């Protein structure tokens, strides 16, 4: 399998799904969201799955969904916690270009609704989770895009430009 996929990683509310859909529209590639795949397989949203079965079970389900991905020419938006699973990340790196949507904490905090349940380890705060994940996103990404206050359409154009430059 070639690396024809574009895989989006980043914190919750960093724009993975929004930018991914824009990239899908611009490139004609299919769009997949691993959280939506999990929901269709389990009948539960990631939030409800974590509440019912716990974070470890969710991360295992997420890993299985990702390891089962055998797609080409697709844009794949992943759950924010995917970087906790080395095997899943190595699989993603093997099937595509991994793009990290790096977004400042203050921007993320303003986007995340207060009642949104995030896949946090050991009851950590959103900020602690953010700090913990940054080195993992950087470790696994092929390309990092500094999102700042950029419009999603500009981020998508920047990603396409970087990929086309090769």
What name fits each language-model region?
Residues 8:
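Hydrophobic anchor at the beta1->P-loop junction of P-loop NTPases
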Residues 11:
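P-loop (Walker A) phosphate-binding loop of NTP-binding proteins
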Residues 36-82, 86-93:
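ATP-dependent small-molecule kinase phosphotransfer cores
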Residues 17:
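Walker A/P-loop
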Residues 95-135:
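A glycine- and Lys/Arg-enriched "phosphate-lid" helix/loop adjacent to the NTP-binding pocket
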Residues 14:
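ATP-binding Walker
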Residues 1-3, 22, 26, 72, ...:
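NTP-dependent small-molecule kinase module
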Residues 25-36:
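Post-Walker A helix-loop "phosphate-sensing" segment adjacent to the P-loop in P-loop NTPases
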């Amino acid at each position: 399998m070639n690396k024809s996929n574009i895989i989006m990683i980043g914190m919750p509310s960093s724009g993975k799904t929004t930018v991914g859909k824009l990239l899908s529209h611009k490139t004609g590639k299919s769009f997949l969201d691993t959280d939506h795949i999990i929901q269709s397989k389990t009948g539960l949203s990631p939030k409800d799955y974590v509440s019912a079965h716990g974070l470890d079970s969710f991360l295992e389900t997420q890993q299985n969904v990702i390891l089962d991905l055998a797609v080409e020419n697709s844009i794949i938006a992943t759950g924010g916690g995917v970087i906790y699973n080395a095997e899943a990340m190595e699989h993603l790196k093997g099937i595509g270009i991994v793009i990290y949507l790096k977004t400042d904490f203050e921007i993320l905090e303003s986007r995340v609704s207060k009642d949104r349940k995030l896949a946090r380890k050991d009851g950590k705060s959103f900020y602690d989770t953010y700090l913990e994940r940054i080195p993992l996103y950087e470790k696994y990404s092929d390309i990092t895009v500094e999102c700042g206050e950029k419009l999603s359409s500009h981020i998508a154009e920047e990603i396409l430009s970087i990929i086309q430059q090769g």
